[in-house]
Amino acid sequence: MSQNFQAGDFLIFQIESGYGLLRVLAIDETEGGTVWHLAAYNEMFMDIDSADAAIENFNNLTISYPHLALTNRAFESTQVARMKNEPLVNEDLKAFVEWQDYLHRKVSDLSVRLLLGLR
């Protein structure tokens, strides 16, 4: 991807009926390639302005998936755009840290849309 994403970025992606939000928790470079660690939010938005307004009060957003680990191919299969960057706090990273401590870590090669059950 041509954009230089970083931890704390809020990303917007389009689905048929509107827009969804993701947040970059971390980006790992491994021998097998890049692994994207994301959180996904429940809220869907009819337009970008509504999503932008929600990000301004992001503590009111609800998280549907606190941690998703995706291959680079899976991440790049859904077009996203950066909306804003906000520093992450320990609570944001809790599920990611638990994943790191887990012996049998799984990284998905499914797109964000498929993982979230969206089209």
Which role fits each region the language model picked out?
Residues 18-28:
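Short beta-strand-centered aromatic/proline hotspots
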Residues 1-4:
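Short, surface-exposed secondary-structure edge patches
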Residues 44-119:
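Intrinsically disordered, low-complexity, charged/polar segments
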Residues 6-10:
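Loop/turn positions that initiate beta-strands
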Residues 27-52:
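Basic/aromatic-rich interaction segments and small domains that mediate binding to polyanionic partners
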